[in-house]
């Protein structure tokens, strides 16, 4: 069973607010988000190959086990924030997707 768990992909879900934010994104940003989502599903929450990736410190608006990266640099910069909801059954929740200026960190 241990080997099966290693190859089992992560499940990526969106919080209700992130799902609404996603609907407002320009097409090229949605494509970048889809690419990041695929990487999260295949490789898990740690994504060092994405621009400005880092874990986030828990805070008032930041849950524990949170991470972020930039999916578009320049003006405006677009950011995605996600958290590990369950390591055992491999669930990641994207809780923010939008411009850097409105990011919760």
Where are these regions (language model features)?
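Enriched for short, Lys/Arg-rich terminal
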Residues: 1-7, 20, 70-105
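Arg/Lys-rich, positively charged N-terminal/basic patches that mediate binding to nucleic acids
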Residues: 1-40
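Generic secondary-structure microfeatures
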Residues: 29, 37, 41-44, 73, ...
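A short, surface-exposed loop/turn module that caps and links secondary-structure elements
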Residues: 42-73
């Amino acid at each position: 069973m241990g080997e099966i768990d290693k190859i089992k992909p992560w499940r990526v879900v969106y919080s209700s607010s992130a799902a609404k934010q996603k609907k407002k994104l320009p097409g090229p940003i949605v494509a970048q988000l889809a690419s990041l989502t695929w990487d999260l599903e295949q490789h898990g929450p740690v994504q060092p190959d994405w621009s400005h990736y880092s874990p986030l410190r828990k805070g008032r608006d930041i849950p524990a086990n949170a991470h972020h990266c930039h999916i578009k640099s320049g003006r405006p910069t677009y950011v995605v924030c996600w958290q590990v909801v369950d390591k055992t059954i491999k669930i990641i929740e994207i809780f923010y997707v939008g411009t850097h200026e409105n990011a919760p960190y």
